[in-house]
Amino acid sequence: MQSQRERPREDRVHEETRGADHAHPSVPHAAAAASATATETATRTMSLHAGGVVVVDGKEKGKKEEGEGKRKGKAPATAEAVRGRARLRGEQLRQLHEIFLRFDLDGDGSLTKLELAALLRSLGLRPAAGDEIHALIAAIDADGNGTVEFDELASSLADLILGPCRPSVAVDQAELAEAFRAFDRDGNGFISAAELARSMARMGHPICYAELTDMMREADTDGDGLISFEEFTAIMAKSALDFLGLAAL
């Protein structure tokens, strides 16, 4: 049997993405677990807006001592990347670093195309087309070595979600529709407070009345007491920022 180190990197990325979905929501502003089914992703996001989010396991997988895992001849972080990293507050930087380590499976301090795509999926995002991940890496990869280091990710992630690169990243509408139907138990096109509470409990995330009230207030932007698909989509689209605590940047 092949060891973890011997197995192909791509196989381990897929396995890591599949297996990281069993954490329980608890600590506010913690990192999202790796991507799973659309309904589970939606449940995590709705739980976030109740004041708790899914926590990636506490182990900083792949972490090495300072100086280890550096590629020979690897370019130092650019001044722009260092400035971008400085924009993040300490807790934000810690959370982002946990996510980075989770997907840097061989611990070499950088993300490949496949690892970056898996990280984006863990935040509820996906490349709009397969070849556009190359454009995302090019936009983030300040030193041009073909991979993404942590300083580059810290510098670029807010712009990736909010700025000029946004057309390259999209919330998966088909998966959102599937998740919405799981909450909309009577199929009338809206999620009521009762449906939301029952769905959260059924999916293993029971919520109290105060949490339910907060969730409805956050999602129900028109104040009609129901969550429409458009409102559901909006709350999901902002989840990546909230997971990382970047919304205030």
UniProtKB/Swiss-Prot annotation:
Instruction: Give the record's keywords alphabetically.
Output: Calcium, Metal-binding, Repeat
Outline the segment boundaries, as ranges, of region: Disordered.
Answer: 1-80
Q: Indicate which residues the UniProt annotation says bind Ca(2+) 2.
A: D141, D143, N145, T147, E152
Q: Spell out the molecular function terms from Gene Ontology.
A: calcium ion binding
**Short name of one Pfam family for this protein?**
EF-hand_7
Q: Which residues bind Ca(2+) 4?
A: D220, D222, D224, E231
Q: Which SUPFAM superfamilies match?
A: EF-hand
Q: Which residues form the EF-hand domain?
A: 91-126, 128-163, 171-206, 207-242
Question: What segments bear the compositional bias annotation Basic and acidic residues?
Answer: 1-24, 57-70
Task: Cite the SMART domains for this sequence.
Answer: EFh
Q: Where is the composition biased (Low complexity)?
A: 30-56
**Where along the chain is Ca(2+) 3 bound?**
D184, D186, N188, E195
What InterPro entries does the record point to?
Answer: Ca-binding_regulatory, EF-hand-dom_pair, EF_Hand_1_Ca_BS, EF_hand_dom
Instruction: State the protein's purpose.
Output: Potential calcium sensor.
The name under which this protein is listed is Probable calcium-binding protein CML12
